[in-house]
């Protein structure tokens, strides 16, 4: 008998999605970081996104070897898949008459998905962001002195943390989307702040560790406070704190932003891969 075809299992429950992808998260924690942390957030706070969906790609033996996620209004996220597998899901969703704002993830797979999607569903695909993936293999070191000191955010900091996280997302995506708060991350001690002269001047947070890997994100210094190295200080200190807890660190950066890329590489992060975000339009 010929082998069974590659199949896609739709999952709409976050806890079930966690179970489906547990093996992949353990074996490919960096690639699955976004999917794993977002899925965790939906287990903790089910209303965080409306209508989330996951697809587990299974090979002929039934093993889950590919992972996809869609949390509207975000583009569909390809966590792990070959270009051929990505094209396969695009064909399935196009045939079902699905509607997607875009796709993001591994460069080759996202490009393959977009090509298949537009050929079947119509419209155009435009690259909106190119992203580098970085990991940390040494203890971070700031190559210059930064005024001030690091501390872990507490509950009283939550309003400021949420305000700055909104500003961080607005700077990347443009205004218009209200982002979920970081109250749980604050409660879990995963938000770092930098204070200087009695004033909080910068922040970053670490995702829950999945497969032993945490993702540093939300790095934000208000524009009027930049130029003092605060972002370097908070990222280095937060990364070191997570390393001390036995977690490996990674992060993503916009490749069009040479400043942030230079900052992270100076701290010891190294570029290990690329992702891409593509927007669909009619």
Language-model-detected regions and their locations in the chain:
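Short amphipathic alpha-helix that is part of the acyltransferase structural core
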Residues: 1-35, 139-174
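Recognition helices and adjacent regulatory flanks at domain boundaries
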Residues: 193-196, 206-209, 228-241, 248, ...
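Conserved donor-binding loop and adjoining core beta-sheet/short helix segment
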Residues: 3-12, 23-29, 36-102, 201-214
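A conserved beta-strand-loop-helix scaffold within acyl/acetyltransferase catalytic domains
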Residues: 40, 70-72, 173, 177-220
